[in-house]
Structures are given as C-alpha cells and as structure tokens.
C-alpha cells in the first residue's frame, strides 16, 4: 500500500526546498550578522542572458551548476545529475522555477539576476505584499543546503553546537537568545540555560562589533564548517550573571519529541510534550508519547509547538490521527495541497495528480515510502 502524499513540504505550503546544485544556506530568519552584499561577477560570454518578462522552460537550466557535484548521492544512491553551468544558469533556473511553482508568482519583481549572488537572488524571489494584519504574506521563504536538509529530515542529524536560537536583532545592538539546547549536545553538556543571550564569541563583541573583520569572525564562529571546531562563548544569563564556556561543534542528534510527561491536574490527567520538528525520526518519539498517554488514560493533551518549524505533511497527518482517534478521522480528509493557478490539478514539484491526504492511521516506513500494517496508538 503506497503512501502517496508525504513529500517534504512544510506545513506552510509556501515553503520550498532548493535541491538544484545542492541548494544553499539562507533563511527568512537572516543570519545573526548582516554581511556586505556580494558584488556581482562580470558575466562571461558563455552565460545565458536574462530578458525581462521572458521565461524559458526549467529544463533549459535544470542541474546546470557553477560548481557541479560528482559521485553518488548518499541519500538516493544515484549519481548527482549536475552538469557544468554558470551562476547565471542557477539564477535563471530559480527564476523560471519560481514563475512556474510559486503561489504568488505574479507578485514577484522580475529583477536583473546579474545584480545579485545566487542566494541573494533567491532571497528576493518572493512577494513583498503584506497580509491585512501587516505581516509579510510569505513568511517562510528560505533556502537550505540539500545535504544538510536530507541529513536532518531523514536521519535527525544537524551540524553545530546544539543550540536553538531566537534571532531578536540581526543588526547592532544584536540580540541572540538560547531558546533551548538539544539533549546530550555540546551546548547542553556545557550547561548553557534557556534564555541566555550571547554577548561575546571568540573574544569578539557580538552585540556591538560592526567592523567587517568582526562580522566575518562572528559568522565563522556561529556556523563552523567542520565538526571539532572549538569556540569560546560568553552569555548573559536571565539573572544577569555571566557564563563563559568553550564548546566544540559536532554532528548533533536532533530529538524532535522532548519532555513527554503526564501531569496530574484538577481536571484529571493531562499529557504534555514539546514537539520541535516534523522529521522522519519524530515518528518513533510520537508513538512512544501516545502509548504512554493511552496507558495513563489522559483526558487532556498539551502539545508545545512554539519552536516547531514544520516538516513532513504525512507526520502531521499521523499526529492528527493520534490526537483525534479513528471515529473522528475515518474516511476524512486531513489536507489538500493548493498550488498556483497554473497548476490546479497537478503537483508541479512531483508531477503527480493532486489528491486529498487522509488521516494516516498506520506506521509509515519512510525509507520504503510505504504504509505498514502496524496501527498507530
């Protein structure tokens, strides 16, 4: 039995993953330090040309990379499809892809890609319109390195120190606060508490240093390229005291489901857990939590989603089934994806016909892409 809808589309359907040429590192939550914009390189004669309002087929630029990957993709066991191209090929693919698949494609400014780096160009390929409440219509526009995404979403591994940060201000005076640390991570082992704010890193004033040298040093320290990098952090804790620690970066095992417990209240037993991300490895933790809730006969449930950034829709369907149960979900639709008016019936990412997603009541073998015969609690 095939589980036909569990792509890595985040819960907000405006999120997109950049898989072409390995993607990049960027986010709607900008890095803690704003860097000087990249100066565009001088185009070479072999580059394709941009023409305002003219969109060539995606296939003309697909997998043409300025720096092609080679060898076998460890997550697909297939050869990388990359061929030699240019930065302009990458940017024009992003442009055409956005025009074909983006929900608000007709609200995207068609700016000359020669004026941007690849990631800088993608960052502005979105609507700038606001909702009636004044918030950005698209609040989930970001790119991510493909290998990093696959490692996190499929294996639950993320590189770094184990911090989950709250980006308060990315310009001076900067504010970067620890929301929580991953259990067993270097950050947790160092005893850095929730609510601590970063004040210095490797001796650099994180809050106020606005020199280019300082900016570069801060970004390099916060986002080390290699595991085993030792970084000196200085934090101001909630009580005003200072905490100085040296932390070594590594491959962090992400725990999506944390702090599952049963609380005795005046209304009876209440189940609680913190749920941070809808990735494949969350399935086991969710099942364990709900097995406990069933055994303890909880009558109320609290799910802490404050730090959840979305993830797989199939997991959201499974979680919803475990909350609502079979009587409320039998033969019901969990969700139906809606794309732009160019794609009313077909998913432009997968090429499959758009069909409603049910409430999945079974454990899913995500590696095989199959529903198993085992029922969820």
Task: Describe each model-derived feature in a short phrase.
Residues 9-10, 90:
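Alpha-helical structural motif
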Residues 1-9:
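Bacterial N-terminal signal peptides that target proteins for export
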Residues 25-32, 40-301, 307-309, 314-315, ...:
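Flexible, low-complexity junctional segments that flank or bridge functional domains
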Residues 13:
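A glycine-rich, hydrophobic loop/mini-helix early in the fold
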Residues 17-20:
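C-terminal motif of bacterial Sec signal peptides marking the signal peptidase cleavage site
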Residues 256, 310-377:
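Gly/Ser/Thr-rich loop/hinge elements
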